[in-house]
Amino acid sequence: EAPQNKGIDMNRCWQVGENYTRYTSDRNYNGEKGFQAYEAKALRDFLIKNKSQNGQTILVDLHGWTQQLIGDVKICSYYEKQFPENNKSGVGRYGTGYLVNWARTYLGSSAGAAKSALIELPKAGVTDHQSVVDKKFSNRYITATLDMLKSIK
């Protein structure tokens, strides 16, 4: 759906409210309107359909490789323990056009607002699949996620 067959950055096309912030650079092009990326539209519809109606909705968005923690302070604290090398300046912030910002706005329930965080994996020393295995990213991520889930009451 993008003009000139341009790809859409699905990480920045999550519209909150009536206004839409456009990014036009080749790296971050996010379309002319929210959810123009069909994958984002499908994921949005799935999340809305499956959100908690009366419990706590928690969303953790994982990608690489900008080595950051962004979003809910408590959620990020679990990942900070496993990824101490990550930049923490985005903790408590949610980004414009990000899934985690949209999620905290639209996935709440009668029990309260949704909690969300974006975990960007570290990039230092990552050159191939084996380096990701050697750095134990999967084990570290799973440990942080299980610790977070165990804390939910």
Which role does the model predict for each range below?
Residues E1-R93, L118-P122:
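Active-site/substrate-binding loop(s) of hydrolase catalytic cores
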Residues L59, L69-G71, S77-K81, G95-K153:
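Active-site-adjacent mobile loop/cap segments within catalytic or ligand-binding domains
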